[in-house]
């Protein structure tokens, strides 16, 4: 019985089935002894069945059954007495009739139960006989017709788990392989960002399309595909209209004109993000208006110059539009050349040209004290993103507009050169991972620009930005050795076989520096820092033999 109970424990259905099979076997044994009267046997069986099936109700039912049995025994004793000696005293006859009435009531109740029981018995006999035909059971305890509980899911149980109390089943640990679980988890939709309010989502998408806060999303892509000559013509047209409007120089008209031009400027912002050199004189004049309160005399002289310039431009445009279009198309072509070089990099680095062309928006945000783009991802998660984004975007945009012409006018340098940190590091926590970490040696972002130092700008600027005094050599070597530069993992592996051991190299350089400071020139271990990369015999023909995985 123990094994059968263990198997039956899995399933309440299999439990009841096994119990009925057991009772059927007992019934067969009982039916072989048919000497008992059938009513008694059925009573006995009814007691048994009710005991097994409803263990909770058992006490109450047993009381009922005992009452019925007593009444039946009365009936069995009294009925023959009634029939044989009808000449007995009236007293006993009255008592007998009373008991007979009670017994008749009980009888009608019993006959229904008996009919139900007989039907059950017949069914159980049939099932039992078919069972014994199919698989003759060696022990009456186990019924092999019930299929075992088979479950394909793999469950492990921890070895030291305490055994469950009897009648409870073991709590299975359903083991999912962690890799699979991690994959499915990463494919779920995030509960945070997707639940942004509809308003916040709309606002953030509108700021995207305006191209102000983040380098142009949809509109920027569309503009990039448009031919650059049409963009140039559009810029020239806007410039002529702006110049006609600007010939009255009163302040209130300037303010009205700002309102009027803001729509044009919004449409041109995405163009600026992609073609910065092409900045039409419209935007420059607009920015100068903003600055006029501070430097009025200088701005007025500049503006008169620019007005004459743009006037001649507009006249030539009216005379022969082809020549002016060609003149601006040349600017656009120069910008597009740089743009292609940048796009090639951006395709590899997954950076927006907006970031790469205006890195000083980075500096502007740093200088203004509140990093505008700072907690963007956290704000999106907490849901407060939509409210702040647009305002901070406009603020940052105006800051950039004010700072840019100042830089261009005061010292006529190109905007400060790109350094690896401001490119690879956006200040959201996910961007700490460089996102190109699997691309090969060519992806090193400094290599593109430092190898071709444009007009000495790279060597001059990267000294101020990056490694400080260490850069003092040629621009190329300095920028490649910049301390902040991170190389990708594969590239580091690929270098490792051809490089001197890093500790040894550092030690030799430190020795050289110390010796130079002490003034001994007698022993210079490999090189002075200036000629380091150029003339050093760094054992590059030897493979590096070392067990260090540095």
Curated annotation (Swiss-Prot):
The keyword Cell cycle applies. GO terms for cellular component: centrosome; cytoplasm; ESC/E(Z) complex; nucleus; polytene chromosome; PRC1 complex. Its main location: nucleus. Keywords: Cell cycle, Cell division, Chromosome, Coiled coil, Cytoplasm, Cytoskeleton, DNA-binding, Mitosis, Nucleus, Transcription, Transcription regulation. Residues 21-145, 208-320, 361-380, 392-465 are annotated as: Disordered. Residues 24-71, 81-136, 221-320, 396-412, 450-462 have a biased composition (Low complexity). The keyword Transcription applies. GO terms for biological process: cell division; epithelium development; heterochromatin formation; imaginal disc-derived wing vein specification; mitotic chromosome condensation; regulation of gene expression. It is found in: Nucleus; Cytoplasm, Cytoskeleton, Microtubule organizing center, Centrosome; Chromosome. One of its GO terms (molecular function) is chromatin binding. Residues 20-44, 105-126, 239-274 form a coiled coil. Homodimer. Interacts with esc, Trl, E(z), scm and ph-p in vitro. Found in vivo in an esc-containing complex, which may be the Esc/E(z) complex. Also found in vivo in a Pc-containing complex that may be the PRC1 complex, but does not interact with Pc directly. Interacts with cyclin CycG. Essential protein required for proper condensation of mitotic chromosomes and progression through mitosis. Binds to specific polytene chromosome sites, many of which are shared with the posterior sex combs (Psc) protein. Involved in maintaining Abd-B repression outside its normal expression domain. This is Centrosomal and chromosomal factor. The lineage of its organism: Eukaryota, Metazoa, Ecdysozoa, Arthropoda, Hexapoda.
């Amino acid at each position: 019985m123990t094994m059968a109970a263990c198997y039956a424990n899995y399933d309440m259905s299999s439990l009841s089935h096994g119990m009925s099979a057991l009772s059927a076997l007992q019934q067969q044994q009982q039916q072989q002894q048919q000497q008992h009267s059938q009513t008694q046997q059925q009573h006995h069986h009814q007691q048994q069945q009710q005991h097994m099936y409803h263990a909770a109700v058992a006490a109450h039912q047993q009381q009922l059954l005992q009452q019925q049995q007593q009444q039946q025994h009365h009936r069995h004793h009294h009925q023959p007495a009634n029939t044989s000696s009808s000449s007995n005293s009236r007293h006993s006859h009255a008592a007998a009739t009373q008991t007979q009435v009670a017994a008749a009531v009980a009888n009608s109740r019993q006959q229904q139960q008996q009919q139900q029981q007989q039907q059950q018995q017949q069914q159980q006999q049939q099932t039992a006989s078919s069972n014994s035909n199919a698989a003759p059971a060696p022990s009456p305890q186990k019924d092999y017709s019930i299929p075992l509980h088979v479950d394909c899911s793999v469950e492990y149980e921890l070895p030291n788990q305490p055994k469950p109390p009897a009648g409870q089943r073991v709590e299975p640990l359903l083991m999912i392989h962690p890799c699979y679980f991690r994959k499915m988890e990463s494919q779920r939709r995030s509960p945070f960002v997707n639940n942004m309010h509809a308003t916040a989502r709309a606002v953030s998408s509108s700021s995207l399309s305006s191209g102000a806060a983040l380098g142009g999303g949809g509109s920027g892509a569309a503009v990039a595909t448009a031919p650059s000559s049409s963009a140039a013509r559009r810029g020239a047209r806007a410039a002529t209209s702006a110049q006609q409007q600007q010939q009255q120089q009163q302040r209130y008209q300037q303010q009205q004109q700002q309102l009027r031009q803001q729509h044009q400027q919004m449409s041109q912002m995405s163009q600026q993000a992609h073609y910065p050199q092409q900045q039409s004189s419209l935007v420059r004049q607009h920015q100068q208006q903003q600055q006029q309160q501070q430097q009025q005399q200088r701005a007025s002289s500049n503006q008169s110059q620019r007005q004459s310039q743009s006037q001649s431009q507009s006249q030539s445009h009216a005379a022969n539009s082809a020549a002016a279009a060609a003149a601006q198309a040349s600017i656009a072509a120069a910008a597009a050349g740089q743009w292609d070089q940048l796009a090639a990099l951006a395709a590899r680095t997954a950076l927006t040209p907006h970031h790469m062309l205006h890195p000083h928006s980075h500096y502007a945000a740093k200088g203004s004290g509140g990093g505008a783009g700072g907690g963007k991802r956290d704000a999106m998660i907490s849901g407060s993103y939509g409210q702040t984004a647009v305002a901070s975007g406009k603020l940052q945009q105006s800051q950039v507009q004010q700072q840019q012409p100042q830089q261009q006018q005061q010292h006529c340098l190109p905007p400060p050169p790109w350094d690896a940190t401001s490119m690879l590091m956006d200040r959201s926590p996910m961007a700490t991972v460089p996102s190109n970490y699997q691309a090969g040696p060519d992806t090193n972002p400094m290599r593109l620009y430092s190898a071709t130092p444009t007009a000495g700008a790279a060597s001059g600027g990267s000294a101020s930005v990056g490694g400080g005094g260490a850069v003092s050599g040629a621009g190329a070597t300095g920028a490649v050795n910049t301390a902040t530069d991170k190389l990708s993992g594969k590239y580091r592996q690929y270098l490792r076989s051809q490089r001197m051991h890093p500790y040894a190299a550092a030690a030799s350089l430190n020795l050289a520096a110390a010796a130079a400071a002490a003034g001994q020139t007698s022993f210079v271990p490999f090189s002075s820092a200036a000629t380091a990369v150029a003339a050093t015999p760094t054992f590059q023909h030897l493979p590096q033999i070392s067990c260090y995985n540095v």
